[in-house]
Design a protein with these regions (language model features):
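Sec-type signal peptide cleavage vicinity
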Residues: 2-7, 15-408, 414-416, 420-422, ...
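C-terminal, surface-exposed recognition/capping segments
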Residues: 417-541
């Protein structure tokens, strides 16, 4: 009795001590789940349990089923779900499989109907011709030695693994005959497990909820696999590279798991995912929702390639901090100062912070209206020449030729879910472009069509893919949000269009310059952009 209590307490201590470590990823070994079963008909194993811990199912009953063998599971570390205090339990619907003396697959004829600390599985067939038998636990969605790790998993409250049985948890064991005629075995898990631990110090996110977590891999992590007794592993190659864990339940968790924690807290939002073991590059998208406004989107984290071994789980911490874009990077073309210099919104100035047309949107006349103002656009122009910017920051932007490479060969991909903030408001939407280092032929002197757009009037439009970068090459892309632009003292088209100046003015008009513009469908690159508009500068990689 004392040893059992001590074992549970030690597990609690280990769990708490691990939570305190500030590692991005840390692996833990699952306790093996010890099971034992009677060797012959009607034989029942007796075991002790503490009244306040493990209560055996029907402890005073005798097994009288002459055609059934009793598989008794009673050790605290044998069960298929784990609570945060270190106790393990069998869940409703759990069953085991064993091949009998005739080589026929036999499934336990009964299963727990409720969460229980111990259970006596009854299995048909004879088990008298061998001193060892292979035991299989394929999970509740599995069959015999076939395991299904589903692409959709559900967890109804934080820090619980009760969903493991339907999420692909599985294991095998060699059952060995004991001196008392019983068989005993220790079940080894064959899946890998992620414990996702998001936190945030962003006060905007403290009022939001985690509604789901999307795990994307560069190779398969979800499919139907085989418990292979020869290799002792899950075998088979699937095609599923994405798992979505839904984190909305009932009552307190009807909106999802809270994000109120500044530090890691499994009790607040700990989320468990079952995946196929292997070496994976994971891109994790945390779906966050502001229930007050209905805004829902993602915060993306990409992990380096790592090995995720069977029978282990990995703490994956994530500091969820929505990318913030300031309001200071809107400029008239090649101006010396930003559009709202001296009138910034964060200093109580008149800079509009809401898109025109929304309730509360404003108009300000405090923008530059003459060339004596350093915020005014560069008026220099020579027809047919390379009219390039001469002031920081515009002079350091990609020129129009380079912009064509981003648009035509940068594989622009729309992301309507990635969350970001600017000037105190939450938005989503933008385009992923390949970094120039990954664009073959990238050339500042020649556009992608072989001409020089700096001195020749030109323009074009390209389609935007609706497919996100995959996990394998996500690091090859950079993100530009749809931050809109300023015109006549009004903020326009934020959360609809991205408008980014190049360093090249038009070769055919003294009032225009090249700007890379995009929405969810197209990327446009034309000269029809008035130099006096306040467009974004920077952000290209």
């Amino acid at each position: 009795m004392g040893r059992l209590t001590k074992r549970v307490i030690n597990q609690v201590k280990k769990t708490k001590s691990h939570k305190k470590k500030k590692q991005t990823m840390k692996k833990k070994i699952f306790k093996t789940r010890l099971l034992s079963f009677a060797a012959f008909c009607g034989l029942t194993l007796a075991f002790a349990s503490c009244a306040n811990e493990d209560v055996a199912q029907n402890p005073n009953n005798t097994d009288n089923d002459k055609n059934l063998t009793t598989f008794t599971a009673g050790d605290p570390s044998t069960r298929t779900s784990m609570e945060s205090d270190g106790k393990f339990f069998w869940e409703a619907g759990d069953k085991i499989w064993v091949k009998d003396d005739d080589g026929t697959w036999q499934q336990s004829s009964n299963a727990p109907t409720v969460k229980t600390a111990s259970f006596k599985f009854k299995v048909p067939g004879k088990f008298t011709q061998s001193s060892t038998y292979k035991v299989y636990y394929p999970g509740q969605n599995g069959n015999q030695n076939q395991v299904t790790i589903p692409a959709n998993q559900w967890q109804l409250k934080p820090n619980t693994t009760t969903h493991f049985g339907t999420s692909g948890d599985c294991g095998m064991a060699d059952a060995s005959k004991q001196s008392n005629g019983s068989f005993a075995f220790a079940l080894d898990h064959k899946a890998a497990y992620l414990l996702l631990l998001p936190r945030t110090s962003n006060t905007i996110l403290h009022d939001c909820y985690l509604t789901k977590v999307e795990i994307n891999s560069d190779n398969d992590i979800t499919s139907t696999y085989t418990l292979d007794p020869v290799t002792g592993k899950l075998t088979g190659t699937g095609t599923g590279k994405q798992i979505v864990l839904e984190t909305k339940g009932y009552g307190t968790y009807v909106n999802g798991f809270p994000l109120t924690n500044n530090s890691t807290s499994a009790a607040t939002n700990g989320s468990y995912v079952v995946i196929k073991p292997g070496t994976h590059t994971l891109k994790i998208r945390y779906w966050v929702k502001d229930v007050a406004t209905g805004t829902e989107g993602t915060i993306t984290k990409t992990l380096a390639s790592a090995s995720y071994d069977q029978n282990k789980y990995y703490n994956i911490t994530a500091n969820l901090n929505v990318k913030e874009y300031d309001g200071d990077h809107y400029y008239m073309w090649d101006a010396q100062e930003q559009y709202w210099k001296g009138y910034e919104w964060y200093n109580g100035g008149s800079q509009p912070t809401l898109r025109q047309g929304l309730t509360g949107a404003t108009t300000s006349n405090d923008y530059a209206q003459s060339n004596t103002d350093p915020r005014y656009w560069n008026e220099a122009f020579t027809y047919g020449a390379d009219n390039k910017a001469t002031h920081t920051p515009c002079k350091d932007l990609p020129n129009v030729n380079e912009m064509t490479w981003y648009a035509a060969k940068g594989e622009p991909r729309w992301d309507g879910d990635e969350l970001w903030t600017t000037m105190g408001h939450l938005y989503r939407g933008g385009v992923w472009f390949k970094k120039k280092a990954y664009i073959s032929g990238f050339n500042p002197n020649t556009a992608e069509d072989g001409t020089d757009w700096r001195t020749n009037f030109n323009g074009n439009s390209w389609s935007v893919s609706q497919t996100l970068p995959n996990a394998a090459d996500a690091g090859n892309y950079f993100y530009l949000p749809v931050l809109g632009y300023y015109q006549s003292g009004q903020l326009r088209d934020i959360d609809r269009y991205g408008c980014y100046w190049s360093s090249s003015a038009a070769p055919s008009s003294s009032f225009e310059a090249y700007s890379l513009n995009f929405d969810k469908h197209y990327v446009n690159l034309y000269t029809y952009n008035a130099r006096f508009e306040g467009r974004r500068v920077g952000g290209f990689e």
